[in-house]
Curated annotation (Swiss-Prot):
It is found in: Cytoplasm. Pfam families: RrnaAD. Belongs to the class I-like SAM-binding methyltransferase superfamily. rRNA adenine N(6)-methyltransferase family. RsmA subfamily. S-adenosyl-L-methionine binds at residues 13, 15, 40, 61, 85, 105. This is Ribosomal RNA small subunit methyltransferase A. Its EC number is 2.1.1.182. GO terms for cellular component: cytosol. PANTHER family: DIMETHYLADENOSINE TRANSFERASE, DIMETHYLADENOSINE TRANSFERASE-RELATED. The keyword Transport does not apply. Its main location: cytoplasm. It catalyses: adenosine(1518)/adenosine(1519) in 16S rRNA + 4 S-adenosyl-L-methionine = N(6)-dimethyladenosine(1518)/N(6)-dimethyladenosine(1519) in 16S rRNA + 4 S-adenosyl-L-homocysteine + 4 H(+). HAMAP family: 16SrRNA_methyltr_A.
Amino acid sequence: MKLVKPKKFLGQHFLKDLKVAQDIADTVDTFPDLPILEVGPGMGVLTQFLVKKERLVKVVEVDYESVAYLREAYPSLEDNIIEDDFLKMNLQRLFDGHPFVLTGNYPYNISSQIFFKMLDNKDLIPCCTGMIQKEVAERIAAGPGSKTYGILSVLIQAWYRVEYLFTVNEQVFNPPPKVKSAVIRMTRNETQELGCDPKLFKQIVKTTFNQRRKTLRNSIKPILGKDCPLTEDALFNKRPEQLSVQEFIHLTNQVEQALKVPIEPVSQIENP
């Protein structure tokens, strides 16, 4: 069976350490009754341990060479190997609208986009695990006051409990990346309603962190208008990295009450 050559433009770094693959596979065990979707299986190093769990497993892979390899290596998965771009998929159709666990050795170049899609489908994904760049994992798990605390931290922690599980050395990949990796698990918290307008919440989080050196007074003024009395609140003396998720929710409610003009659509705010 011909091996697949990693493609740089797809951000492929194939995992070759079986112990690490087994450890990643075991992170899905917190939801033993749910089906599993693996993103970016490559040559199936992680897949081989997922299928042993005797659960419905589907894999989605955009690389046609990897798909051909998987179909030959895992004939029992034939009907569940999906050649597609995960970011463009309708996840409602995957398991007939039922929830599932998301996992994978995620490509570095789209990991943030994967997690934004997870947030858009949070009612379908009660648990997301997998391996990403260590720096991104630290950002997601960071708390207020940390230099790595940012947009992903707040948006994900609003809906998920984040666990930084373990760090992975560069040498367990082919080719070795230039940075370390980490395995994380994100589990849906008890939040059903955010307690504020979710679109405005997202807009405020992105707007303030895109100007993270400014105080909230200066970063929010373009939204509220320079003469809005709300900016006299002491909260506006803080910078975004000083605010907890709950404080961002409180801020969103204050801004919503003060707004006199239509809100700029979130789609026009640039992703990090």
